[in-house]
Amino acid sequence: MSTKVKKCREPARVTLPAPEEEDGEAEGAEPQRRRRGWRGVNGGLEPPCPRAPPSPGPDASSEGSPSRWRTAGMRDKGRRQAVRGPAFMFGARGPSLTAEEERFLDAAEYGNIPVVRKMLEESRTLNVNCVDYMGQNALQLAVGNEHLEVTELLLKKENLARIGDALLLAISKGYVRIVEAILGHPGFAASRRLTLSPCEQELRDDDFYAYDEDGTRFSPDITPIILAAHCHKYEVVHLLLLKGARIERPHDYFCRCADCAEKQRLDAFSHSRSRINAYKGLASPAYLSLSSEDPVLTALELSNELAKLANIEKEFKNDYRKLSMQCKDFVVGVLDLCRDSEEVEAILNGDLESVEPLERHGHKASLSRVKLAIKYEVKKFVAHPNCQQQLLTIWYENLSGLREQTIAIKCLVVLVVALGLPFLAIGYWIAPCSRLGKILRSPFMKFVAHAASFIIFLGLLVFNASDRFEGITTLPNITVIDYPKQIFRVKTTQFTWTEMLIMVWVLGMMWSECKELWLEGPREYIVQLWNVLDFGMLSIFIAAFTARFLAFLQATKAQQYVDSHVQESDLSEVTLPPEVQYFTYARDKWLPSDPQIISEGLYAIAVVLSFSRIAYILPANESFGPLQISLGRTVKDIFKFMVLFIMVFLAFMIGMFILYSYYLGAKVNPAFTTVEESFKTLFWSIFGLSEVTSVVLKYDHKFIENIGYVLYGIYNVTMVVVLLNMLIAMINSSYQEIEDDSDVEWKFARSKLWLSYFDDGKTLPPPFSLVPSPKSFVYFIMRITNFSKCRRRRLQKDLELGMGNSKSRLNLFTQSNSRVFESHSFNSILNQPTRYQQIMKRLIKRYVLKAQVDKENDEVNEGELKEIKQDISSLRYELLEDKSQATEELAILIHKLSEKLNPSALRCE
């Protein structure tokens, strides 16, 4: 086979049957035409081997000239080999192209501006919408190779199709100038041209987008602005936003509207993919930066929405999590670009000027964005140095100099506050607006006061049990009374002074929790697990004291009966009614449901929960904070593990009980003979405290005994070797995750603790918070007054807006809002932007510039080299065209000159 035939097949990159030998000896004329013009022969494809060209004569066209062959050979070795070469997977349905169309597509692909211009101007039979076997027309080929001049020439044709496809291609490659040229086409003047997806426009429109049944380069639901957002093309997104393009946020996942139901019914997968594509566009930093008036708030809310979708749509969990993290990184990136405290405060507080004065009155630093970031667990944003520095400044507010003091000085301050807490509370009640009041209202002092109050509460709990540290003097079967007619239960149910103080503290803490529940709302209150722990602890305390009080009331009634009906001095000689006699019994004869017994059990649980609440203040310390976080994560792992543990435990507990339930009294020990004994044996065997003889029978029933040995052995292997080691591995993994990012985790937990003391209120800790201060009454009256004033102002404004002389102002405001909707760009969001909007505009400019610089630094040189090659290719064709024109002009001049010099010779001829 000849070399030329191999060269002919090589660009097509398909495997073809070997042609006849005489075909291989042919030399290729018009190689480009043969390379493109494939025809079906006998149901197959005709191999792209050129037939022997006709011998060039004096009248041969330029297409058959050797220079034409060389040009075609160079193109065969060019950068787009086999682009239009067919392959069997595309079938034989591709349209046949004429020589003119072949030449036109070649010129558009390689940037031959003179040829394209000439054919568009002179040719009458040229089909500008002709496509190659891949379905690409001349406009797409020109756009794909970044030939701006060719694109502009093609866009001047009135009947040009698939302009939308070319726009998507230009956006994907980042050709901004070509995008501008295409957007200037009259076809984009139609309403909603940029907002509808190609699939929707194909159903209601012409061939602005042309999608075949085999699919194309882009998904049918991709709009130009979605694609630009996916590719992070800031300039393109800006252009499209100016044209009115927007990304519509998908409906809620559980939406049951007619549109969503129809899409879900037709193709659930396509519906899900279209939602992901839309969210990818919405979560793009380019779209967030340029489309939103408040990008930080938009990104925070979108990150939370995407995190929820990750838990709902499990099949696309990783995609949604990645997008959620992308939104969080955007917020952190904007915060990182702050250069002064004003910019940091703007991001952390949000637009305070848009908040009502009544809501803004409380504290100058609302920290609304920080609260939102904590709620949505944007940990890197909260732990960022810029945010932490601002929070630390607020933490030591009104305490100048304490921030720079040593730990010893701070500990001394804590001790002084703890010892002088009652006096500080009295001083605050008397003069809440004095210097002392301002100091006590600082977040640090509020934290110290509450911590000191809680430590005093724990001290009371310990002191209440101190009389029993070395044991009790009265045995459970002995009753001790103060005087002969006294009922024993009256003595045991009386409240001591320490218990009364504990009750006062509990009431104070419950009052604080109720106020917090009222201010935050039930939903926000329950989300914080510490609130659930506090409420549960206090509820158990109240239940314990209530049961104790009921027992005291019953004993008091019995004592009243004795005092009024019994005349004897010794109750042991008197027959009392059963309901009264019961209260004279010793502890060993009390019923299990006795209120005092229930009270003591609940009180013990509440004490345990009270001491566990110390972990709430541990994040304030850098050493103990990460440990507390690891402990919390470990508890979560244990709860997850308990599901599998309980399943295995119940299986073996019931199985062993069924096996040995018939052998009660016939075993070495009572293990597994009852459900209770089965539970005890299996539970303590986890810690190695159960004996192997638990399965041994006194009878010679070896089969049952052997089954017991096997089941007991399998249980120990499963629980001890497998499940417990799995739990240890889970705990180790969780601890390692915290340790790897301990600084961020600790700062996030510390910020949550700090933030609970930043808001106004909670100045005095329990139980001092039970007594309302004069300031509370003043603030209550001020709030009522401000509320009535604001309501009067709103009514007055409504009346003014309803009058005819204010219609012009209303129209101006409406026009301003419409301009805001049409251009979310760098220019001006409002005619008179607020200070917050000015700062956000400045930060977004920095972010966009930084993103563009980073992209330029990350770009590979291959793209630049390709662009240079394409420019050189276009320049080559222009130079060749200029050379051809110069040659023709020179030939004409020579001919005219020869006519003048040799007129006689020409006449003779």
From Swiss-Prot:
Known regulation of activity: Activated by diacylglycerol (DAG) in a membrane-delimited fashion, independently of protein kinase C. Activated by inositol 1,4,5-triphosphate receptors (ITPR) with bound IP3. May be activated by internal calcium store depletion. Inhibited by intracellular Ca(2+).
Recorded catalytic activity of this chain's protein: Ca(2+)(in) = Ca(2+)(out)
Location of the protein in the cell: Cell membrane
Binding site for Ca(2+) 2: E513, E516, N531
Residues binding Ca(2+) 3, per UniProt: E859, E862, E864
List of glycosylated residues: N477
Cytoplasmic side: 1-447, 516-528, 619-637, 728-909
Membrane-protein topology: Multi-pass membrane protein
InterPro entries (alphabetical): Ankyrin_rpt, Ankyrin_rpt-contain_sf, Ion_trans_dom, TRP_dom, TRPC3_channel, TRPC_channel
Chief site of localization: membrane
Record family assignment: Belongs to the transient receptor (TC 1.A.4) family. STrpC subfamily. TRPC3 sub-subfamily.
PANTHER family, per the entry: SHORT TRANSIENT RECEPTOR POTENTIAL CHANNEL 3, TRANSIENT RECEPTOR POTENTIAL CHANNEL
Task of the protein: Forms a receptor-activated non-selective calcium permeant cation channel. May be operated by a phosphatidylinositol second messenger system activated by receptor tyrosine kinases or G-protein coupled receptors.
Subunit note: Homotetramer. Interacts with ITPR1, ITPR3, MX1 and RNF24. Interacts with JPH2; the interaction is involved in maintaining Ca(2+) homeostasis in skeletal muscle and is mediated by JPH2 'Ser-165' phosphorylation.
Protein name: Short transient receptor potential channel 3
Organism: Rattus norvegicus (Rat)
